[in-house]
Amino acid sequence: MFIDEAKIRVKAGDGGNGCMAFRREKFVPRGGPSGGDGGRGGDIVMESTQRHNTLLYFRYNPEHKAERGEHGMGSNCTGRDGKDIILKVPVGTVVYNAESGELLHDFQQPDERLIVAHGGRGGRGNQHFATSTHQAPREHEMGYPGEEFTLRLELKVLADIGIVGYPNVGKSTLISRISAAKPKIADYPFTTLEPNLGVVTVGEMPHEETFVVADIPGLIEGAHEGAGLGDRFLRHVERTHLLVHLVDVSDASGRPDPVADYKTIAAELANFGGELEDKPVIVVASKIDSVNPDKLKKLAAMAKRRKLPFYEISAVTGQGVQQLKYAMAERVRELRKQTQIEL
């Protein structure tokens, strides 16, 4: 888990100005005031969604300004209201006023809505200022300004997917391929000393989806008892939706049996306890750019026997990475729906 933060500036739309106008029609030489009111400025609205689970969008888009209302017109025509801006935030986002520190809202369920900045009221046209003794008023109101705030967004991010496997099987290279994360990568075990989190984006705005992958530091036999980098990293996997288990099928690993490698790590996950043993798994044959065909065949047969999804990739050349990325996105989407139903 890590804390994702973003600071944004929101400005609701100003109200439109009221109009000063008089009725001018044939045979009506002294028409009364007919100035319409200005439209209301657009609000800035936050809405929680399960389609995203990071604040990455707000890091790159810190300024949000709603449309102002249109000015009033003659013939008592009111100006059009400004369009609201809907900002989609992940469930779990906490919103603070950055200047006062006041907690504004904690989005705990999907589809919650909060107006974080109200649009300004439109000004009144001169029709409102007519009286029995003042029948041709020239007064009219300017629109009122929309609210403007600096907000701080905070989100506790949990990885959707944990990438597991022996040290040096290509986990860090994979996460650098499918996300913007830049983990330290080298050809020796335990390069990764802390979990690396990467945000993966699939699709394009406004329909893009994101999910978070955690590159869990290499596990070895006895990890649940603290061997290698210890059981503290297994705790990072505990709250993920899905495991992607990388197995080296090249000769570089120095280990002759990929099925034994898979079973060793699977046993460590099971021995740790909790729900790790029952998590959905995608099996991935890694380093197929220098594949040992016998190893690949053995691993594929094992995955088929266990009815587990199976993919072949080379994170170095990119072969098979896109197919795996979209399979991960589809599985996360399904698991999020299941979780929502259970809740």
From Swiss-Prot:
Domain Obg: 1-158
Cofactors, names only: Mg(2+)
Residues engaged in binding GTP: 165-172, 190-194, 215-218, 286-289, 314-316
Physiological role: An essential GTPase which binds GTP, GDP and possibly (p)ppGpp with moderate affinity, with high nucleotide exchange rates and a fairly low GTP hydrolysis rate. Plays a role in control of the cell cycle, stress response, ribosome biogenesis and in those bacteria that undergo differentiation, in morphogenesis control.
Family as reported in the entry's similarity comment: Belongs to the TRAFAC class OBG-HflX-like GTPase superfamily. OBG GTPase family.
HAMAP family per UniProt: GTPase_Obg (MF_01454)
Name of the featured protein: GTPase Obg
Organism: Acidobacterium capsulatum (strain ATCC 51196 / DSM 11244 / BCRC 80197 / JCM 7670 / NBRC 15755 / NCIMB 13165 / 161)
Gene designation: obg
